[in-house]
Design a protein with these regions (language model features):
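Flexible, glycine-rich phosphate/dinucleotide-binding loops
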Residues: 84, 215, 223
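Short amphipathic alpha-helical/adjacent loop interface patches that line ligand
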Residues: 24, 109-112, 136, 178, ...
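Positively charged, aromatic-enriched patches within helix-turn-helix-type DNA-binding elements
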Residues: 140-205, 210-212, 217-218
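N-terminal/domain-start alpha-helical segments
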Residues: 1-122
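Short, Lys/Arg-enriched segments at the junction into DNA-binding effector domains
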Residues: 2, 110-168, 219-228
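Structural detector for helix-capping/boundary residues
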Residues: 43, 106, 130-132, 137, ...
């Protein structure tokens, strides 16, 4: 599960990243707020942990902007402000939970789990292929219980192939699915993404039918998924 952390305190950030990764999360850490706006336009996260006291933009302003732009991911606010009014402002701006520094990392973990679990009031739907799990809502992938970090195009390609497992898809079909009619796409883009998927998951996952296209076999036709 992928988390975005926006925190400018290096010592605190280091500790949070270590604790969250130890708990199985994939963590992207930014020390300023404005880059988060760009990242969230192109990347998918299960939750955002946001410090209010950032060097380039106030966290409340950042949160309001995210909500105005339609971002619905769960947000956990971190701040040194302990006044009731500050907590109310944060919640009214669109945060889902609030923690006051200093805090125990165990509590952060517990709150984050609860936040993701109750996000949108339901468990996230999954697509399963053997030991591979895809979470379409957050575009996250796990393999044998471990998170696998994919680019948006890699995720989309994997989803397309698994959704149609047992069917050969031509390079042109896959390129159309990924890029539409964008003539600026590299001619070997599909091959590059497939190469990366094989490295990040396992080499036998995607088969090349020479002169025809690519296929992920149906599970009853597939070889046993190898252990890492």
């Amino acid at each position: 599960m992928r988390i975005l952390l926006v925190e400018d305190d290096v010592m605190l950030g280091d500790g949070m990243v270590d604790a969250l990764r130890h708990s199985g999360y994939t963590v992207d850490w930014l020390q300023q707020g404005l880059p988060a706006l760009s990242v969230l336009k192109s990347e998918e996260f299960a939750a955002l942990i946001l410090d209010l006291n950032l060097p380039d933009i106030d966290g409340i302003s950042l949160l309001r902007k995210l909500r105005r732009e339609g971002h619905q991911l769960p947000v956990l606010i971190l701040t040194a402000r302990d006044a009731l009014d500050d907590r109310v402002v944060g919640l009214d701006a669109g945060s889902d939970d609030y923690m006051v520094k200093p805090f125990a990392l165990q509590e952060l973990n517990a709150r984050l789990r609860a936040l993701v679990r109750r996000s949108k009031g339901q468990a996230q739907a999954t697509l399963e292929y053997g030991d591979i799990l895809l979470y379409p809502e957050s575009q996250q992938v796990t393999y044998q219980g471990e998170p696998v970090r994919l680019t948006p195009h890699e995720y989309k390609l994997l989803l397309e192939l698994i959704s149609q497992s047992g069917r050969v898809l031509s390079k042109e079909q896959l390129q159309q699915s990924l890029y539409g009619w964008d003539e600026g796409a590299e001619s070997n883009a599909v091959e590059v993404h497939i190469h990366h998927l094989r490295k990040k998951l396992y080499s036998e996952l995607i088969r090349n039918i020479r002169g025809v296209g690519y296929i992920i076999p149906q599970l009853d036709q597939a070889t046993r998924i190898p252990a890492r």
